Amino acid sequence: GDGDFKNDGTRVSEVWNGRNWEVYQEISGLPQGSYKITMQGFYSPSSGNDNAWHEGWGQEGDETNKILGYLFGNDASEPLLHVTACPQEENVAENCEEVTWTDDASLAGKWLCHGKNSAQEIFEQNSENYLNATTCYVGEDGKLRIGVKMSGVSWGQAWVIFDNFQVEYLGADNMEGAQTALDALVREANGMLASEVLTTQEAKDGLNKAIEAASAVGELTPEVYKEQTEALNAAIKFGQESMDAATALEDKVTAHDKKLSGTGEASYEEYSNTEGYDELYDLTIEIFDKIDGEGIFTTLDEINDYSVRLDKAYSKMLSGHIDFTTANKDEPVDATGLIVNPSFQTKTENDKGEIVDAASADGWLVESLKGGSGVKDAKVYEIFSDSSEVYQPLYNAPAGYYRVVMNGFYRAGGFIDAGVARRDSADAQNAELFVKCGDGNWIEKLPSIFEHVSELKYDGSDVALPDSLFPKSNELYHFIVDQPAGAALAFEDGAYECDTYFYVGEGEVPVLGVRKTGMLTNDWSCFDNFRLYYYGDGDANRPDGFVD
């Protein structure tokens, strides 16, 4: 997850400025049965009042103080105590915040924890202070996953602090923990049903079915518990996937609508005479009618179909000005318009009303093992210490031969470890440009970061490597880029170019992307600036460098 996790300097731990995260430990080899978990800790909506929870306190319908941090054990979870649950009469450890924002007699003029030092002292003064508790159930696998988590936060400086976890075994025949876990899942499923977030009828039906089955349970046994929790978890997972997909589609169609109705650089005005523009416009109207009219989609497949149709229409619009008929082997046509967002940036309007380039991953699909992938402020794509695949289908590509060119590199570990491996001719090549189309599969390894070592820096973040790593070099300094900002400047200079040819058969849709198949500690890849060239079809236009 995200957020700043710290346990230094005091005997308590915290996660600050996070939105969706878990901190947990898994204990194995435990006997089956119920367990009681206690922990001292609290949830603060925002240590800096970013979401105005001070102003919302005590107000009817207040959502700013809804607790979004939880103590959990396996399937059971319990909202954490609010930071206001244990007000102090004095400024403990000179690390508290005085309550001046409410007339509530239980809080006004008192002090609340505002850091780890005050939390530690208050926890240690009395073991009942900020004491959270829940019961849970350990099944026949003997595993207990215990911890704290946060989800659903959309503002800054949300804060959870915690310490002193204790676990008590309640016995094999005690089903209290199982009932608590089942109740928690039913509560979560009901909350998802009641949510006003856009979703599908398919997901709601699944949640209702799981809730009804769990609510009809009589005597709870280990077997019944396992069956019901599996059904509820599956329904909740699918419900969340449906909500996420519906929200993503709504965001996508809203962004298209804004640019379709706008004018100037940040709009689609220059494509208004293309067939794709009209198709995209009509489709946005259709989707908005669905959202505003029915207020719900039928199935997840319907959402995915709408998303693909949007992508196809958008790609058709972007490539609407390309004259593919003039292409031949000697004079290929620039077909970069077939790639949605080839340079990971989009035109947008800033707070001053200025049109600027903003980092964007629109158009690209990502499959990531650890979540260490994304577009950075420098408007390049970065994969750090992760295995990922970043790709997109190239809709509307006519049959024929193509060449794709991009800039990108791979560093096999931290810069020193990678440098040693390079010197010893042992550096791995775990990142590659790829195109898949029909039965064809074209791959080109990304250049090593050491294929462009310079005596001068591109950016202040570039690092100097020891001369011993370059025994055959006469250069005075050996700099390589070490941050996306430096990578972007190197790419602008033409460094780290990588390319491959590929062929598209009639009616086929090629998939273009970059993937990192292996993962080394601190290994790193950056890439950007995709360009696409079309050579036409037929043997006469087969490029000399093409390989089947």
Which residues does each predicted region cover?
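Extended, low-complexity, turn-rich repeat/linker tracts enriched in Gly/Pro/Ser/Thr and Asp/Glu
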Residues: 16-18, 31, 42-64, 154-158, ...
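Exposed low-complexity, polar/acidic, P/S/T/G-rich flexible segments that act as propeptides
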Residues: 157-176, 520-541
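Extracellular beta-rich ligand/substrate-recognition surface
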Residues: 8-22, 121-126, 376-389, 487-493, ...
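Extracellular glycan-recognition surfaces and repeat-rich motifs
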Residues: 1-11, 340-384
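Extracellular carbohydrate recognition and processing domains
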Residues: 75-141, 155, 440-507
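Beta-rich interaction/scaffold domains
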Residues: 173-333, 541-548
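Short beta-strand-plus-loop segments that form exposed binding edges in beta-rich domains
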Residues: 148-158, 489, 513-524
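Extra-cytoplasmic beta-strand recognition segments
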Residues: 21-52, 132-140, 146, 165, ...
